[in-house]
Amino acid sequence: MIKVFIAGATGWAGSAIAKGVYNEKGMQLAGGLSRFNKQENLAEILDFGNDEIPLFGTIEEALEQVDFDVLVEFTKPDIAKKNILSALNKGKKVVVGTSGLTNEDYTEIEKAANDNNT
């Protein structure tokens, strides 16, 4: 079972990805990140029924409190870079859907991924 955490989980793209992950066999939606709905139940916000899926306001909180394998990143570039680097530095795999990152950002992200064997 692949445990997936989504940054930007209540946005238009993030919520669509969350629904896909939630319904996919072999995947578990471990939690989400939202600057607007922190401390709420993602399952309730996205109408998944009675499940409890934690929602956090910062990646640091999530990394301390939730076990996940993969971060799917769909926020804004300035937030995304911090989220990506934090996850990579904790040994998490990362999928980036955020646009607007610079070549310098990607160079730094690639170095962090290589340094952490992710």
Regions picked out by a protein language model, each given a short descriptive name:
Residues 1-5:
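Extreme N-terminal starter segment of soluble prokaryotic enzymes
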Residues 23-48:
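NAD(P)-binding Rossmann-fold cofactor-contacting core
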Residues 63-65, 70, 74, 78-96:
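Rossmann-fold NAD(P) dinucleotide-binding segment
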Residues 51-65:
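Short acidic low-complexity segments
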Residues 18, 22, 88:
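Gly/Ala-rich phosphate-binding loop of Rossmann-like dinucleotide-binding domains
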Residues 85, 89, 98-118:
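Rossmann-fold NAD(P)-binding glycine/threonine-rich loop
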Residues 7-10, 14-19:
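N-terminal Rossmann NAD(P)H-binding glycine-rich loop of SDR-like oxidoreductase domains
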